[in-house]
């Protein structure tokens, strides 16, 4: 199976965790896109979705799935999204698609976070994939200097503006041995909106696409 076929397999496998009559939290990216396709097949069985990006919102609407504003829901039964990296503690790096802040908000609201990935995303130590940090534009240089102090090599993601009107710094050369601590440290830097470490609120269930099929991992 190709990598995209593995992504499709986990996207459709996630339907098993969707409760009829609920609003579903939906992520962003190539794997989440397959889940949206799958969700379209049961659109008459769900109330709708809350989306983490304009791109996902557009796709959901194109499939006839109602999209609710995050402020319209008190909680979500489930949030389904991919990851750029995930470790054995189900902590993740996310934000390759620049939707990390909205993804983190939806993860916080959701009772259950189902992470859908292909096996290539599994790592022992987070950090080989550059760590995205969403930053208010006027603070870009200051935040970059602070990230250097933490041992990283930040690079400005050119020609990218988030759905919130901010910029992204991708932090290279990190071996993240304590993801929760680093998440807290970076989030305390003035001008940081959020960091793409999902460590304090990790996944509850991981669906991992392998050549032998979809593996379900729980804590």
Swiss-Prot record:
Question: What S-S linkages are listed for this chain?
Answer: none
Xref: InterPro entries: NagB/RpiA_transferase-like (IPR037171), Ribose5P_isomerase_typA_subgr (IPR020672), Ribose5P_isomerase_type_A (IPR004788)
Please tell me where substrate binds in this chain.
28-31, 81-84, 94-97, 121
**Which Enzyme Commission numbers does its entry carry?**
5.3.1.6
Superkingdom per UniProt: Bacteria
List keywords of the entry alphabetically: Isomerase
Q: Which CDD domains match?
A: RPI_A
Please write the reaction equations for the catalytic activity of this protein: aldehydo-D-ribose 5-phosphate = D-ribulose 5-phosphate
**Pathway assigned to this chain's UniProt record:** Carbohydrate degradation; pentose phosphate pathway; D-ribose 5-phosphate from D-ribulose 5-phosphate (non-oxidative stage): step 1/1
The molecular function GO annotations come to:
ribose-5-phosphate isomerase activity
Which top-level enzyme class is recorded in the Swiss-Prot or TrEMBL entry? isomerase
Q: One Pfam family from the UniProt entry?
A: Rib_5-P_isom_A
Report the record's Gene Ontology biological process terms. Answer: D-ribose metabolic process; pentose-phosphate shunt, non-oxidative branch
A Gene Ontology term for the protein's cellular component: cytosol
Q: Where is the active site?
A: 103 (proton acceptor)
- Quaternary assembly: Homodimer.
Could you tell me what this protein does?
Answer: Catalyzes the reversible conversion of ribose-5-phosphate to ribulose 5-phosphate.
Classification via HAMAP family: Rib_5P_isom_A (MF_00170)
Q: Member of which family?
A: Belongs to the ribose 5-phosphate isomerase family.
Know the name of this protein?
Ribose-5-phosphate isomerase A
According to its UniProt entry, this protein's organism is Photorhabdus laumondii subsp. laumondii (strain DSM 15139 / CIP 105565 / TT01) (Photorhabdus luminescens subsp. laumondii)
